[in-house]
Amino acid sequence: MYSIVKEIIVDPYKRLKWGFIPVKRQVEDLPDDLNSTEIVTISNSIQSHETAENFITTTSEKDQLHFETSSYSEHKDNVNVTRSYEYRDEADRPWWRFFDEQEYRINEKERSHNKWYSWFKQGTSFKEKKLLIKLDVLLAFYSCIAYWVKYLDTVNINNAYVSGMKEDLGFQGNDLVHTQVMYTVGNIIFQLPFLIYLNKLPLNYVLPSLDLCWSLLTVGAAYVNSVPHLKAIRFFIGAFEAPSYLAYQYLFGSFYKHDEMVRRSAFYYLGQYIGILSAGGIQSAVYSSLNGVNGLEGWRWNFIIDAIVSVVVGLIGFYSLPGDPYNCYSIFLTDDEIRLARKRLKENQTGKSDFETKVFDIKLWKTIFSDWKIYILTLWNIFCWNDSNVSSGAYLLWLKSLKRYSIPKLNQLSMITPGLGMVYLMLTGIIADKLHSRWFAIIFTQVFNIIGNSILAAWDVAEGAKWFAFMLQCFGWAMAPVLYSWQNDICRRDAQTRAITLVTMNIMAQSSTAWISVLVWKTEEAPRYLKGFTFTACSAFCLSIWTFVVLYFYKRDERNNAKKNGIVLYNSKHGVEKPTSKDVETLSVSDEK
């Protein structure tokens, strides 16, 4: 019992400066850690002229795959590292292997360690499980709570609109959509600095500080007396929330491996649905119990309560967010756990964040803009940001148009779709991670998304069909954790490239919603929204098709790096014989140089 108290209370307190400020942890890699990456160790072993013993460990007659393990000993440092290679003959490779997303990413032996019913990969050590559990609490769980309050502050305007704000402030015509756009514009503009600084700043300081700032602005929204004042407040709320979405996605890519990331990102997205769900419940409770208290309408109290919750969560963030493995500020991770997190990055071939290199490197930018990633992924994300009708508030506006529900009942009914969305989200995350098929997870969600929006575009259907269609609306967003996690994996080899691509694709995609929403989601057309539902269905279809383009380029990159993933390729049909272990060793040394 004492050891537990010491690890979660006593030791963390000792790591605080002046008893309340988390500071950067100074943790040096041990010699064993520095030599634990397989290729470096193999290279050193060969250069030391140590002997190598090669032997067959696994043979799959079905696929004619061979595994060989080379064991190298370096007596100087007492390091013994084993690396397994799969020797794969690509002669007569069937066409359907194109759909095997992990064909060149992980070898068959590693695949055998993945069990769909287990949260951890088979063979994960106790220390690594402990680290992952800590990260799940400190990063994944906290990010969920942070996204929850962020979304409370984002969508509360829709609940306020149907709870009396429209009449109190004199909303007319398209004022609602214009107010929503002001938030988006502020959010986009203030993402631009993070194009350069996302991987250069201690995010454990930045994110909570911005949380506190937008909390104060949310209080201000409770006291506005005109639509222009509300628009100004929403602009600055969007500005202070600008980096949060990007930053959490970046942090997931800094700690988790490719087949762990989607579930954690999906857990983060749960905060979005909890925010939508609880916004209706909170507004319903507030309107019923606080409407008129101290002369304030119920919708104004809603903003105040949202702000109070945001302040509390922001303060917790200073102590919960861990930074990243090479710039770690966590008071809860031990030195050995920080080293283990770094080792996991090396195993996943993830480039480390570096606060010390120069901010603007023209060579790096040329490399980024001459590569496929920034263009293909940006267009992909534009389809993603426009493939849902949730943010339009169409469901709530349709319910209100029926003129049969009281305001508290409207807010209660608004909780149904995000509740279902949470189920869709976790199901999609499990499909992507545990079945090792992110493309299938995306297609799975978009089939239902297209069906729902097509029904709503038709509109002249039975009321039950409309209920069914609106119940499917959260399938549109369910694939977003998959997309962002996949982007992290695609760009994993260089941290700055990963950050720049992430910010660029997000800015461009979110920018598209700022003007598209004005064109297709005009408030005066509610709740019919013919253009909106039609455009959303088309975006979902384009997203599905473009996912296969991403899959093609992703697999091409992974094939070029197959050996680093433990897969040695050859084609006997073209007269290329199976390489020997010595050939692979020589190539490993060559690659390292």
From Swiss-Prot:
One Pfam entry name: MFS_1
Gene source species: Saccharomyces cerevisiae (strain ATCC 204508 / S288c)
Family: Belongs to the major facilitator superfamily. Allantoate permease family.
Membrane topology of the entry: Multi-pass membrane protein
One Gene Ontology term, aspect cellular component: cell periphery
Protein name (database record): Probable transporter SEO1
Signal peptide, first to last residue: none
Keywords on record: Membrane, Transmembrane, Transmembrane helix, Transport
Location(s), subcellular: Membrane
